[in-house]
Amino acid sequence: MEDNEIKLLTRLFQDAEIGMISIDKVIKKIEDSAIRKMFIKQYEAYDKFKERCDVLAVNSEIELKENSAMKKFKQTAMVYLSLWKDKSCRHIIEMMITGTVMGIVDTIKTRTDCGVVSPELSVLVADFQKMQEDFYEKLKKQLAKV
């Protein structure tokens, strides 16, 4: 696996991890069972995606780096700070929409910056972007209901 592909795979893995961290922190604050279930499904989808990244890394004989402790702490602190201001379901959904859009943009930029990659990695990137876009659509629908 080329350096640009390792960078891309690592970034996908780390972005999925950030999504899981964010969901883990907000899910405890959600009282609406339908919205909670939606976030649980998103968490599980991120987890399965991380597993796919792990499999590709093992098959390519590379080790993926997790997010640094500082980045995890920063993400957790940002979520808690935002929740401290407003714990409403509407605010949580708005916050997750913002994070999801940031993830979509990051995926597109990183993919473009990495240039030509293997077909297997291209499929993984496309699947991750599609997954995030699906999350975005579901979050928009929930926002319209609250």
Give the ranges of each region predicted by the language model:
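Alpha-helical bundle segments that constitute or directly flank the non-heme di-iron/ferroxidase center
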Residues: 1-30, 91-115
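Alpha-helical scaffold segments that form or flank carboxylate-/histidine-based iron centers
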Residues: 4-12, 33-51, 89-95, 119-131
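Generic structural signal for well-ordered, non-membrane alpha-helices
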Residues: 14-21, 25, 44, 48-51, ...
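A structural signal for long alpha-helical coiled-coils and helix-turn connectors
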Residues: 24-31, 54, 61, 81, ...
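Conserved alpha-helical segments that form or flank metal/cofactor-binding pockets of metalloenzymes
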Residues: 37-70, 139-145
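Carboxylate-rich helix-loop segments that flank metal/cofactor sites and access channels
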Residues: 51, 55-104
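Preference for long, well-ordered alpha-helical segments
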Residues: 96-146
